[in-house]
Amino acid sequence: MATYSTNEFKSGLKVMLDGDPCSIVENEFVKPGKGQAFNRVKMKNLKSGRVWERTFKSGESLEGADVVDRDMQYLYNDGEFWHFMEPESFEQFQGDASVVGDSAKWLNEQDTVVVTLYNGSPLAVTPPNHVELEIVETDPGLKGDTAQGGTKPATLSTGAVVKVPLFLSTGETVRVDTRTGEYLGRANK
């Protein structure tokens, strides 16, 4: 596996630290007036999700993590596991609630998601940035009911709840940003 020196550190780089795969969230090069230069690095443990800060002297190196991001198709949830399939090889992977996490509320069957694999097993699931989901439950919007800024809560087909404009009703399909959970607009169908 490749090794990365401190001058190669950048956001998103995946390295091994204390036996666990980690991702660099932030990297700051510091050159004090006196003493040796160093990197102040904010890292996220890909297994536990814990984020912490650590400093490395200039010239130190870390081993690259055997972590691969692959596009996969979400198949189904059997109550305990979420199942994903590699489109080229048709190889299937399954992840539990700790792997899927908050992404579960944005997963729609047949959607393409990014699955992070470590030693052949899923570590994390990243949904697409924008998804189209159907509204299954929302209050009817009454004319003149804009005391709250013109939005109302709506439950989507995956169970996620988002704020939508008053003119939308049950059965309509909307586009949602999965990173922020915000309504983007009606889906073009």
From Swiss-Prot:
Coiled-coil residue windows: none
Keywords: Cytoplasm, Elongation factor, Hydroxylation, Protein biosynthesis
An annotated Gene Ontology molecular function: translation elongation factor activity
Name of one Pfam family that matches: EFP
UniProt keyword annotation of NADP present: no
The protein's annotated pathway: Protein biosynthesis; polypeptide chain elongation
Statement: the UniProt record of this protein carries the keyword Protein biosynthesis: yes
Modified residues (N6-(3,6-diaminohexanoyl)-5-hydroxylysine): K34
Entry's localization field: Cytoplasm
PTM note: May be beta-lysylated on the epsilon-amino group of Lys-34 by the combined action of EpmA and EpmB, and then hydroxylated on the C5 position of the same residue by EpmC (if this protein is present). Lysylation is critical for the stimulatory effect of EF-P on peptide-bond formation. The lysylation moiety may extend toward the peptidyltransferase center and stabilize the terminal 3-CCA end of the tRNA. Hydroxylation of the C5 position on Lys-34 may allow additional potential stabilizing hydrogen-bond interactions with the P-tRNA.
Superkingdom field: Bacteria
One Gene Ontology cellular component: cytoplasm
Biological processes per GO annotation: peptide biosynthetic process
InterPro entries reported for this sequence: Elong-fact-P_C, NA-bd_OB-fold, Rib_uL2_dom2, Transl_elong_fac_P/YeiP, Transl_elong_KOW-like, Transl_elong_P/YeiP_cen, Transl_elong_P/YeiP_CS, Transl_elongation_fac_P
Role, per record: Involved in peptide bond synthesis. Alleviates ribosome stalling that occurs when 3 or more consecutive Pro residues or the sequence PPG is present in a protein, possibly by augmenting the peptidyl transferase activity of the ribosome. Modification of Lys-34 is required for alleviation.
Family per similarity comment: Belongs to the elongation factor P family.
Protein's UniProt name: Elongation factor P
Species name: Teredinibacter turnerae (strain ATCC 39867 / T7901)
